[in-house]
Each structure stands twice: as C-alpha cells, then as structure tokens.
C-alpha cells in the first residue's frame, strides 16, 4: 500500500476502512519509515511540531473493588504497591506546582476505584479551583465511572477534560474484567460529553488481544469522538493476572500509534503508560505519529526522568506546546 498517498487522502477527508487499518498493523517492517512518514504528514497538518505535555497525580492508590487483569490496584492483584486513600488538597496543589515548573500543560488528577463518591468530587473540585487560580493549568480528571450530576459539578469547577478509557475492544473486554461492562465505560464517556467536558478515552495494547481487536478499539474511539486518545502499552506487573505477558515489539507499537493517527487524524494521540519498556530505543519515533506524552511517573510504575523527555523533544526539533496554546486548542474543540 502507498502510505503517503493514503495519508494525503486522510488529510483530504477520507475515513479509512477497517481493512486499510488492519493493513497498517500487518504492514512489512521494512515499510515502517514510509508508514511513519505518512502518519507524520497527518500529524504535522493538524499539530505541526508541537507536543503536549501531561503529568499524573495519583491522588488515591489501591483499594479498588474492580477485577481488571492488568491493574496492580485491583481487588485481585497481589502486586506490592503503595496504597493510600485520597490525598489532601495540599498534596494535589504541590503536584500542580511541579507540573507548572516543568512547563506541563495538562495536570491529570487520578483516583482508583469504581467511581467517585460525592465527597471525592467535592474534594477534587476544591483543589481544581485553586489550581486554576494559581497556575492556570488545564485539568484532566480520571476518577472512574461518573454520574451526570458529578460531571456537571466537575465542569462547573473548571475541569477541562475527563479520562475514562475503553481499554480494549468490546469483544475482548470480558477477558480483562468482569466487574463492569464495556457499556459502563462507553456510557461514562457519553456522560462526560453531555456535560460539556472534553472527553479523553484510550486503550491498553498488549493484553492478548488480536490485531482485529486493536482496529476495533480505534474505530470505537473514532465513533465516540474522543478529543484525546491515550495509547498505553501493557507494562506487565508481577502479581497481576497479566504478569509475564510480553507480546509487544517496538516496531509493532509504532504501527499501533500510526494506526490511531490514520484512523483519528485530528485527535490528540498520546503515548502513555508502558512507552519506555515497550518502545525502548525507538521512543522518539513514536512522536512522528503521536503529538502528546506523559512525563514523570505513572500510577504505580516509574517513568523516565523528565530531562530525558525534554532532550528527546529537543533532538527531534519539536516544541512543547504552551499552556496558553493548549487552552486555545481546547476552546476550539
């Protein structure tokens, strides 16, 4: 397939088919640079050489009643993690200060559990208002399954974006968790959209799914019209049901990122958890398809040093998108 021609057709408005998407994942490895060139042509059309930086605050860790097979915080995990209840407001504000110092545009407040209590919502919204007043950061919340009235409260407090991943395909979902349904996840994204908050929803690749499942994930997110799509690559943690699963190669991960760029050309594609251990030395190439990364640590696993990420961007000739630019792009969605 002519990847450069396909990319140009995407820029002109073509929505690629499932067969074309599957061809991306099945493409010969020696076509990788051509595939990435096409993905970069699309990425550059909509985002230039700007990169959005995101940072996570793990505001509540562990104690989750759900049985997600990939997660070290789940009820079935035996992984030794640092579990704690919701942190105080001062800790959340300290994280925001650190994000501001590192020129991060989006600060992500994440809490474990099936969904937030009303008390959790009150606590988070109080912190969000202070962060907005003090640092002006864009705020993404990730608190679990959300009720409409909770979404409205978050919106009123100034939350810009809400993350709730579909994680995998509808077909593969019950192989990963049975404590909630795929529809529960999709419904939360719809609740977020209805409230006026920008929806963020993504995937975890490498959980024994098929290539067809990965294509289904991308098309589901295209249908959901998620503004931001975090693409995680499984970091198999000892003590979880998926421990020891290492199916991914750096080249396949790059094909996955390219797939999401071709299927969702105008969306923020973020290289998320597991990028260091799965992309390895090919991490920089991922940004030819994606336009966003997390810096710093993840929820229960360590990321690489922030200085290393900034060096990657400098070496690529890319620029960090400023907070002001991120606000402007959000208002345009």
From Swiss-Prot:
Domain of life of the source: Bacteria
Domain (Radical SAM core): residue spans on this chain: 46-275
Gene3D superfamilies: Aldolase class I (3.20.20.70)
InterPro entries, A to Z: Aldolase_TIM, BATS_dom, Biotin_synth/BioAB, Biotin_synthase, Elp3/MiaA/NifB-like_rSAM, rSAM
Sequence positions that bind [4Fe-4S] cluster: 64, 68, 71
Keyword Iron in annotation: yes
Keywords: 2Fe-2S, 4Fe-4S, Biotin biosynthesis, Iron, Iron-sulfur, Metal-binding, S-adenosyl-L-methionine, Transferase
Required cofactor(s): [4Fe-4S] cluster; [2Fe-2S] cluster
GO BP, sorted A to Z: biotin biosynthetic process
Pathway in which the depicted protein is active: Cofactor biosynthesis; biotin biosynthesis; biotin from 7,8-diaminononanoate: step 2/2
Transmembrane helix keyword on record: no
Any one Gene Ontology molecular-function term assigned to this protein's record: 2 iron, 2 sulfur cluster binding
Binding site for [2Fe-2S] cluster: 108, 140, 200, 270
Catalyzed reaction equations: (4R,5S)-dethiobiotin + (sulfur carrier)-SH + 2 reduced [2Fe-2S]-[ferredoxin] + 2 S-adenosyl-L-methionine = (sulfur carrier)-H + biotin + 2 5'-deoxyadenosine + 2 L-methionine + 2 oxidized [2Fe-2S]-[ferredoxin]
Stored HAMAP family: BioB
Name assigned to this protein: Biotin synthase
